[in-house]
Amino acid sequence: MTPDEPKETHFGFRTVAEKDKAGLVHGVFSRVASRYDVMNDLMSGGVHRIWKTAMMDWLAPRDGQHLLDVAGGTGDIAFRFLDRAPGARVTVCDMTESMLVEGRKRAEAGKQADRLAWVTGDAMALPFADDSFDRYTISFGIRNVTRIPDALAEARRVLRPGGRLMVLEFSQMPVPMLQWLYDRYSFNVIPVMGQIVANDRDSYQYLVESIRKFPDQETFATMIREAGFGRVQWRNLSMGIAALHSGWKL
């Protein structure tokens, strides 16, 4: 590739120009926003709720903390954080306005709206000052980012010294036979489910493919370290179908 040629990345299994990926991802989540939470329950059999509980257990929210939840549109992580720490605050940042609309609806139906802020923004260029937040979370979102190292660098920038990053993302199973079975379910069932429930097979085909393009647990941990985080650790969930990664701005 010459300096004048456009840089390329992946969109699921497709190769696309870097400049086009964000728009393609935005299109996916704009289309699925209204059915996003329902599909999470159906695709995982509700297990995503257990994973998010494990995330909160490890994150240990405290009153007075300010959380930035990136790619958090419908507010699932934000609401869980505030349930654990009623005296905390959460800013939810998402590039897709229609996802934020769904989150605001949920907030207005509850009692947490005054502790929540909703901001449209890009994980690779966050619209916040340095050292603004105590905690940064991103749940099932970082694999959709065009340049993951840029998003991790931004996470570190906006965290205060002593702040903590936590990522919940699909990952790789260490047992080949289990991975094979999981792949069969993912490729044969989830897109069909997306068509039936959300009338959108293609978006869920992309989501399945994007999981396979995301790095394994140790490779991603190395990326977090290279972004400048310390005390980096990871934990498998459901035998590696998903994983939690934690790092600190020291």
From Swiss-Prot:
EC number(s) reported in the record: 2.1.1.163, 2.1.1.201
One GO term of the biological process aspect: aerobic respiration
GO molecular function, one term: 2-methoxy-6-polyprenyl-1,4-benzoquinol methyltransferase activity
Keyword Transferase annotated: yes
UniProt keyword annotations, A-Z: Menaquinone biosynthesis, Methyltransferase, S-adenosyl-L-methionine, Transferase, Ubiquinone biosynthesis
Reactions catalysed according to its record: a 2-demethylmenaquinol + S-adenosyl-L-methionine = a menaquinol + S-adenosyl-L-homocysteine + H(+); a 2-methoxy-6-(all-trans-polyprenyl)benzene-1,4-diol + S-adenosyl-L-methionine = a 5-methoxy-2-methyl-3-(all-trans-polyprenyl)benzene-1,4-diol + S-adenosyl-L-homocysteine + H(+)
Top-level division of the source organism's lineage: Bacteria
UniProt similarity note: Belongs to the class I-like SAM-binding methyltransferase superfamily. MenG/UbiE family.
Reported function: Methyltransferase required for the conversion of demethylmenaquinol (DMKH2) to menaquinol (MKH2) and the conversion of 2-polyprenyl-6-methoxy-1,4-benzoquinol (DDMQH2) to 2-polyprenyl-3-methyl-6-methoxy-1,4-benzoquinol (DMQH2).
HAMAP family linked to this entry: MenG_UbiE_methyltr
Annotated protein name in UniProt: Ubiquinone/menaquinone biosynthesis C-methyltransferase UbiE
Protein species of origin: Paracoccus denitrificans (strain Pd 1222)
Phylogenetic classification of the source organism: Bacteria, Pseudomonadati, Pseudomonadota, Alphaproteobacteria, Rhodobacterales
The encoding gene: ubiE
